[in-house]
Amino acid sequence: MSVTLHTDVGDIKIEVFCERTPKTCENFLALCASNYYNGCIFHRNIKGFMVQTGDPTGTGRGGNSIWGKKFEDEYSEYLKHNVRGVVSMANNGPNTNGSQFFITYGKQPHLDMKYTVFGKVIDGLETLDELEKLPVNEKTYRPLNDVHIKDITIHANPFAQ
């Protein structure tokens, strides 16, 4: 199961882990299928750490799940922030997942069991390189020039009716 994020700087193909994180993947894939993420900017970009998106308001404070409320974390001892390109839900503490997610630029073991890992980049690491190079506001880590998710291709959706 995979999706491709088509961004202003290139494509990123992500494998999603539906068996280990079914609720998170159901939410993510439904948001992808409904074009929820289309036009979202990468609003937080910290070199060597991660890049974050998934907030339609572009502020880093917005975004909802498909259920209209925050939902619980899905941790697995098998899913770690152990390589470049891990995809996780962003949150504001335990069980506060909505629509925002981030992609790591490297190993981030301090995030394990605090953020739900639900995917990994399987193609497009060069696009991740381009994102990491973007100049940012040094206080807010927001890229100086907006980079958007233009649209998303779903390659196979096990939750589709």
Curated annotation (Swiss-Prot):
Give a Gene Ontology cellular component term annotated to this protein.
catalytic step 2 spliceosome
* The enzyme's E.C. designation: 5.2.1.8
Q: In which tissues is it expressed?
A: Ubiquitous. Detected at low levels.
The record ties this protein, via CDD domains, to: Cyclophilin_PPIL3_like (cd01928)
Family named by the database record: Belongs to the cyclophilin-type PPIase family. PPIL3 subfamily.
* Binding partners and assembly: Identified in the spliceosome C complex.
Protein name per UniProt? Peptidyl-prolyl cis-trans isomerase-like 3
Taxonomic source organism: Homo sapiens (Human)
Gene name of this polypeptide:
PPIL3
